[in-house]
Amino acid sequence: MIMSKETLIKSIREIPDFPIPGILFYDVTTLFKDPWCLQELSNIMFEMYKDKGITKVVGIESRGFIMGPILATRLNAGFIPIRKPGKLPAEVIEESYDKEYGTDTVQIHKDALDENDVVLLHDDLLATGGTMKAACELVKKLKPKKVYVNFIIELKDLNGKSVFGDDVEVESVLTL
């Protein structure tokens, strides 16, 4: 698996100064367009969670919507979207969080989860952890049995894992 992870890392496109000057953007869409990379990513994540009893995979808009449903299918679980305000049609609950230049909000359907669910919360990249921390707090409001958090990539130098409590297992497929 070490060789496959190295191949996946080499397949990620790096875009300097995007979305603003000084930022190095890791473009995971290159993993999705390559059939081998997509399958390998799916296999690795499945192996990480196949014995955890996952009942729902929750993906964060928008790149969490790519691997989330694939993983949900493989785990025989449902898929639940977390979206920006105004995008979900039924009654929602929400969580707001601070960003570098203001605040943002994420929402989930109020009836998306219950106390019987074991949740895998997924997004593409862990940087500072703000968005996923808000998503995690949002999911916890619905009182599932357990919450796992997963990323494709973790930017280790930004120490995003530190925002999560000890009650949440946070794992990444790749660490940069």
Swiss-Prot record:
Function per UniProt: Catalyzes a salvage reaction resulting in the formation of AMP, that is energically less costly than de novo synthesis.
Binding partners and assembly: Homodimer.
Keyword Iron-sulfur assigned: no
NCBIfam families: apt (TIGR01090), PRK02304.1-3 (NF002634), PRK02304.1-5 (NF002636)
Pfam families found in the cross-reference section: Pribosyltran
Record flagged with keyword Cytoplasm: yes
Domain of life assignment: Bacteria
Pathway(s) the chain acts in: Purine metabolism; AMP biosynthesis via salvage pathway; AMP from adenine: step 1/1
InterPro entries found in the cross-reference section: Ade_phspho_trans, PRibTrfase_dom, PRTase-like, UPRTase/APRTase
Catalyses which reaction(s): AMP + diphosphate = 5-phospho-alpha-D-ribose 1-diphosphate + adenine
GO CC terms in record: cytoplasm
Protein name per Swiss-Prot or TrEMBL: Adenine phosphoribosyltransferase
Family: Belongs to the purine/pyrimidine phosphoribosyltransferase family.
Coiled-coil ranges (or none): none
EC number: 2.4.2.7
GO MF annotations in UniProt: adenine binding; adenine phosphoribosyltransferase activity; AMP binding
Localization in the cell: Cytoplasm
CDD domains: PRTases_typeI (cd06223)
